Amino acid sequence: MLLMLSQWLQGLSPEFGFLRVFQYLTMRAVMAALTALVIGLLAGPRLIRMLTSLKIGQPVRGYGMETHLAKSGTPTMGGALILLSIAVSTLLWFDLSNRFVWIVLLVTLGFGTIGWVDDWRKVVNKDPEGMRSGEKYFWQSVIGLLAALYLVFCISENSNAQVFELFVTWVQSGFALDLPPKAGLLVPFFKEVSYPLGVLGFVIMTYLVIVGASNAVNLTDGLDGLAIMPVIMVGSALGIFAYVTGNAGYAKYLLFPHIPGSGELLVYCAAMAGAGLAFLWFNAHPAQVFMGDVGALALGASLGTIAVIVRQEIVLAIMGGIFVVEALSVMLQVTWFKFTKKRYGQGRRLLKMAPLHHHFEKSGWKETQVVIRFWIITMLLCLLGLSTLKLR
């Protein structure tokens, strides 16, 4: 918005020439981060007071960690603060004509809405389970598939008109269409190794990445500050990848696919980092507010969508290794329990408790130890992911 305003003012008078600074992507990214940070810090106390007055407190499962019972009643749905900060800051500083940022915003707010309904049911109905898994998965699938269907053609073409033409061509060809190499699965650490996916393969993979990342972040969000800092780190790293793929010169030099317009996602990633830091101010142990599903589902989906756009799905799995392991720990725990119950008549557990962070708590780690150690691991994984920029 401010970019368009600055361009309009420059056209009116040469005296506004100093506003050309807003044309620089890096400048707008810095301003987006600062804007989101300030909005979050200023709005945070008011939101916490409002949630407290409305008695929107987090119910704690009776079969959960005993040490977490004291957290019962802590205001939840604080993820709304993150989404507000991201949305306002991004709308102020990004190029409004950029379709990639719009699709990420829509996916983020869509998954945020699902999370809001889930949190609201937990609070109003006093039901720790909230929205039933089937219903939640259905709406996640609807948004994920719509985003995937748009992105498969959006990444292949440079304008919405061309996207529509490619879609029509795909339908007329009997749903058989070869996509350009940049729409393939990019393998890190190798020079220009890209496996063709086809339209169906791209849609399925994108759907799995978006929905999977959303649920993985949600499962990780179980301790004070545990999820938000890895989200900040991974999001910031993806912003660097977005800057590279959006710049023809850097993309060619580093042997990355050039995705025109993807660089503008740096503004969104910066806003996410600023909003995340503001939220961490209030979410640090002992937390004054919890993110809730409204934040966790939305942030995870946004990371997945950005990774798809910049063609770094595998790198996302590397940098977000904590999210992956947390999700796998739950799936393995549930699968093993059901298998052993069916075979031996009594369910057995692989871990003391799932997700993995609760296993370490049961093993004697303090909550802050688990959180900070997971942060350190994520930082190292992000550095490994960023090394793929050059190690090819």
Swiss-Prot record:
EC number(s) per entry: 2.7.8.13
UniProt keyword annotations, A-Z: Cell cycle, Cell division, Cell inner membrane, Cell membrane, Cell shape, Cell wall biogenesis/degradation, Magnesium, Membrane, Metal-binding, Peptidoglycan synthesis, Transferase, Transmembrane, Transmembrane helix
Catalyzed reactions: UDP-N-acetyl-alpha-D-muramoyl-L-alanyl-gamma-D-glutamyl-meso-2,6-diaminopimeloyl-D-alanyl-D-alanine + di-trans,octa-cis-undecaprenyl phosphate = di-trans,octa-cis-undecaprenyl diphospho-N-acetyl-alpha-D-muramoyl-L-alanyl-D-glutamyl-meso-2,6-diaminopimeloyl-D-alanyl-D-alanine + UMP
Biological process annotations from GO: cell division; cell wall organization; peptidoglycan biosynthetic process; regulation of cell shape
Pfam families the UniProt entry points to: Glycos_transf_4, MraY_sig1
Stored InterPro entries: Glycosyl_transferase_4, PNAcMuramoyl-5peptid_Trfase, PNAcMuramoyl-5peptid_Trfase_CS
Membrane-spanning segments: 24-44, 76-96, 100-120, 137-157, 170-190, 193-213, 225-245, 262-282, 289-309, 314-334, 369-389
Enzyme class: transferase
Compartment(s): Cell inner membrane
CDD domains for the chain: GT_MraY
GO MF annotation terms: metal ion binding; phospho-N-acetylmuramoyl-pentapeptide-transferase activity; UDP-N-acetylmuramoyl-L-alanyl-D-glutamyl-meso-2,6-diaminopimelyl-D-alanyl-D-alanine:undecaprenyl-phosphate transferase activity
GO CC entries: plasma membrane
Associated pathway: Cell wall biogenesis; peptidoglycan biosynthesis
Cell inner membrane is among the record's keywords: yes
NCBIfam families assigned to the protein according to its UniProt record, in alphabetical order: mraY
Function recorded in the entry: Catalyzes the initial step of the lipid cycle reactions in the biosynthesis of the cell wall peptidoglycan: transfers peptidoglycan precursor phospho-MurNAc-pentapeptide from UDP-MurNAc-pentapeptide onto the lipid carrier undecaprenyl phosphate, yielding undecaprenyl-pyrophosphoryl-MurNAc-pentapeptide, known as lipid I.
Similarity field: Belongs to the glycosyltransferase 4 family. MraY subfamily.
UniProt-listed HAMAP family: MraY
Record's protein name: Phospho-N-acetylmuramoyl-pentapeptide-transferase
The encoding gene: mraY
